[in-house]
Design a protein with these regions (language model features):
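Sec-dependent signal peptide recognition
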Residues: 2-10, 14
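Short, conserved sequence motifs used for protein processing/export or organelle targeting and
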Residues: 90-117, 121-255
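Aromatic-enriched hydrophobic runs in primary sequence
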Residues: 3-4, 38-41, 49, 53-56, ...
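Active-site-proximal cofactor/substrate-binding loop regions of enzyme domains
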Residues: 11-14, 21-112
């Protein structure tokens, strides 16, 4: 399904805070020497061709009910609402996610957006359905290093350090993704379907644009406001080149 839409302004909320926090409840993540792959799926409960893509995304989870993916990729399902008019409102959708999809498309030279769309490291990835569950994990050196830690119940901080030879300008965003959501669709193209979702983006927060010399660390602070009891979640931080959309590095932690 394809749809052309005007860009919607994104209003980001981010805050820094400090608090005493039990070390035994904290979690951390440290990036590696190679760039992590970032997969974004743009999907909708109102799209009849989206359930197979949602099922494929769920197949990337680790076994035995663990969170994350065995490959180490960062996986995110952005639900969009531009098919809500067909008759079913996607409760996970946000205009900010549509805006992000549109921005990604513009960086890749696309004039339209569609669902389901997979984006790999900032570029349209149409061969996701032919991957056979194998993710194209490259060995490209990381453009930045990231160290993330939890400093409060819903408070996080990270240090981003650009690599030598990488772009001096970078941007970042945080997401909260949750597993194990489901919906019984009562109307629209998927009427009567029972849909199951993993890696659902419940919070998306742009973290700003930065210019820094190589090896110059930048501290980011953030508070999560999204948490659904009973659902395992991931805290993700993605650093990318704002001129191309290309991923520089990313980390994910089950917090």
């Amino acid at each position: 399904m394809k749809f052309t839409i005007q860009i919607i302004a994104v209003y980001a909320l981010w805050t820094g805070a400090t608090a005493s926090f039990s070390a035994q409840n904290s979690c951390t993540a440290q990036s590696g020497a190679t760039r992590a792959s970032v997969i974004e799926l743009y999907t909708s409960e109102g799209c009849s061709s989206c359930p197979p893509a949602d099922k494929w995304l769920s197949s990337l989870k680790t076994p035995a009910g663990e969170t994350g993916v065995a490959s180490g990729a960062i996986v995110q399902a952005f639900h969009v609402g531009y098919w809500d008019y067909i008759g079913w409102v996607d409760r996970f959708a946000s205009p900010a996610y549509t805006t992000r999809q549109r921005q990604q498309a513009a960086l890749g030279g696309q004039s339209t957006i569609y669902t389901p769309q997979a984006v790999l490291n900032g570029r349209d990835w149409r061969d996701w359905h032919g991957s056979g569950g194998r993710l194209p994990l490259g060995k490209e050196p990381a453009g930045a290093s990231i160290s993330l830690r939890q400093v409060g119940d819903d408070q996080f901080e990270a240090t981003v350090t650009p690599a030598v030879g990488a772009s001096s300008t970078w941007s970042a965003y945080w997401t909260v993704t949750e597993h194990g959501h489901s919906s019984k669709v009562k109307s629209g193209e998927n009427a009567g379907e029972f849909l199951q979702h993993d890696f659902v983006v419940r919070q998306y927060t742009p973290a700003g644009d930065y210019t820094a010399a190589p090896k110059t660390p930048q501290k980011l602070v953030w508070r999560s406001i999204a948490a659904t009891p009973g659902h395992a979640r991931q805290i993700n931080l993605v650093v990318f080149d704002p001129k191309t959309g290309k991923t520089l590095q990313a980390v994910s932690a089950a917090c």
